[in-house]
Amino acid sequence: MCRMQKITQVSCPGKDKVEPESTPGVPSIPLRATDRKDGADLFERILERNNLNCAYKQVKRNGGAPGIDGMTIDKLLEYLHEHKESFLESLRNGTYRPLPVKRVEIPKPDGGVRLLGVPAMIDRMIQQAISQVIMPIFEKEFSENSYGFRPGRSAHQAIRKAQEYYNQGYQRVVDIDLSKYFDTINHELLMNMLRKKIHDTRV
């Protein structure tokens, strides 16, 4: 199971850009999002300069332990500058392959362990860049009562909603935890759902 990355919609002002807008650097391509209504330009939007800058900044804010390659967040920008051409080319030609996730055991209160997969920093940045583009597409499809890992929503809002239901007279709560959900979800079904909304086959 992979550790979820925090997803936010931000304008990303300030320093520490992957590539400053006025200075050639790392990593971006000279393409601007066309915002085609058929969604066939998602790949360009993912690799657009500002989107990559935002993705890098968000990964830096999230922090977290290194992945299997041992790269820390402090080394990510240096890596991007040194490997600009090969990094971008691998994304464009479809040869980019994410690294295996690092398996980590987290102790559970009942004595067991929760297995987590920690992605490499560069993979987190790419995941974040993709999420920032496709999140608005799927956000409107989610349940109004879903509060987990969604921009602009929080656990506090979920608590307030529960209090609202309690004040309406509801007195019972059903606590459900799906065992090994990310390991057992039907990925083919999930991919079919994604294909219905994402028409850019490069993504």
State the predicted function of each range.
Residues 1-203:
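Non-catalytic terminal/accessory segments
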